[in-house]
Amino acid sequence: MLFSKLFAPTLKEPPKDAVLKSHKHLAQAGYIYQVGSGIYNFLPLAKKVLDKIENITHKRMQEHGAQNILMSFVVLASLWEKSGRLDKYGKELLVFKDRKDNDFVLSPTLEENITEIAANFIKSYKQLPVHLYQIHTKFRDEIRPRFGLVRAREFIMKDGYSFHEDAESLDKEFLNTQSAYKEILSDLGLDFRIVEADSGAIGGSKSREFVVLTECGEDTIVVCQNCDYAANIEIAKRSKRPEPLNVPKAQLAKFPTPNTTSAQSVAEFFKTEPYFVLKALVRKVIHKDKETLACFFVRGDDNLEEVKALNALNIIGANALELREANEEDLNKAGLIAGFIGPYGLKKHVSYIIFDEDLKESDCLIVGANEKDFHAVGVDLKGFENLVYADIVQVKESDRCPNCQGELKYHKSLEVGHIFKLGQGYAKSLKASFLDKNGKEQFFEMGCYGIGISRLLSAILEQKSDDLGCVWTKNTAPFDVVIVVSNLKDEAQKKLAFEVYERLLQKGVDALLDDRDARFGAKMRDFELIGERLALIVGKQTLESKEFECIKRANLEKQTIKDIELEEKILEMLASE
């Protein structure tokens, strides 16, 4: 490719609203162009990178037995009604009407669509298992699109779905796809982790995330320093903590505690640890057609994990869509006093009460007395009936691993893939069944598997690039080599550059010849910005010495290559990381 023919509209400065370096570099280097909030055009350089990512994905998925299809981006809303997700998914689901007043959605995921296909065409266990996948555009109407391709509204996704006759077959495919994803991300040259995760709006019994470690990541993962335990903070677990020695033993009594509304201030008032203070967190629960209140109790030195809390509510049948923090008006209407909320008589004020599992059968607790400026001491939870316990706390750094007691640490990460065991939920709601070996009708066991293809552009750059511009990995750079002519007006330099260009092309090197009538410094700046893997300099010294200066983009390391060894050395450098 000649640079003079390449459509790569680089900018002098990155967009003012760009925060992440990946967003800055992709926009400034002419990879992407924003046309609306969270909506981007992919220009030739970005398309080359996308094609490479997609080719790797196709190769690995098909090696693992998956078949490529292409489903409609527009789906009947009635399918989403049948699955129950039309209301559950929320405002991120874009719903519209056609001219005949039919309701449709722009797909953020395609569980309903693929399940309908299976229901219509898979009739017997003899056709199972089957794994179908696609790479296609998706749309999620994010409330705050940001960070360029990291949280866009329109994005490119690889999503796959598998159908099975039993849970054992699903388990095998879950691990098979996990292996495929590991190979894909390894081929892309990424440092990643596999972590246990929440299934979210997609649902299912088990899910794992594939996350790229980067300080700009939106997610926090909890990693054991001693074993391979890793989980998204939303579902991370810990070992039971040892009880502090300073136990506030007391007879059950009510004490005046003026102006002590925090767990820390209550602990200081009674000269004990926040561990023994029962902290109440009230949340407004949003249902499909109503709002209620829930109170969650954790120890005073713990924090509530909102995702765990929402899941705990739904396990007991709340059918909650989301949680919001209850404000002072909400508390006043319920007859509650912030800072003094406790379990005594609480059922008449809120619809749901859940205690963290770490509190089970705890005694010597200090709790709010549901009376302004009063707390109760010497409280024993064994004296209460029918309490609901669940894991609802957010794991802290220095907590201990649930598997080996090792120390837990936080890491920032960016999710790039997710695999789920969906079970029979979608099959039952959409009446997708087959006949088993005994001729009996059974519902499909389903798996769901996704990779954010367009997000991977940002993930690679967040992990690999520097302040100068894009640094791509071995298998993702838009070009292997850019040949930079020091002085294009020197016919000898120009002639040699074109000869070298042809020599490299014949060896299968994806080369870019910078034949633009521009300053040498500007050309090198574009090399740093765009991120070809190597820059080969053709200058006056090259003509005299028959040696080329070659620069690696990853570390800007310079190397001298003799003309006679040019192709061999370039291929060696490209073969290495």
UniProtKB/Swiss-Prot annotation:
Coiled coil: none annotated. It comes from the Bacteria. InterPro entries: aa-tRNA-synt_IIb (IPR002314), aa-tRNA-synth_II (IPR006195), aa-tRNA-synth_II/BPL/LPL (IPR045864), Anticodon-bd (IPR004154), Anticodon-bd_dom_sf (IPR036621), Pro-tRNA-ligase_IIa (IPR002316), Pro-tRNA-synth_IIa_bac-type (IPR004500), Pro-tRNA-Synthase_IIa_type1 (IPR023717). Pfam families: HGTP_anticodon (PF03129), tRNA-synt_2b (PF00587), tRNA_edit (PF04073). Its main location: cytoplasm. It is found in: Cytoplasm. Keywords: Aminoacyl-tRNA synthetase, ATP-binding, Cytoplasm, Ligase, Nucleotide-binding, Protein biosynthesis. Its EC number is 6.1.1.15. GO terms for molecular function: aminoacyl-tRNA deacylase activity; ATP binding; proline-tRNA ligase activity. Gene3D superfamilies: Anticodon-binding domain, Bira Bifunctional Protein, Domain 2. GO terms for cellular component: cytosol. Homodimer. Catalyzes the attachment of proline to tRNA(Pro) in a two-step reaction: proline is first activated by ATP to form Pro-AMP and then transferred to the acceptor end of tRNA(Pro). As ProRS can inadvertently accommodate and process non-cognate amino acids such as alanine and cysteine, to avoid such errors it has two additional distinct editing activities against alanine. One activity is designated as 'pretransfer' editing and involves the tRNA(Pro)-independent hydrolysis of activated Ala-AMP. NCBIfam families: PRK09194.1, proS_fam_II. This is Proline--tRNA ligase.
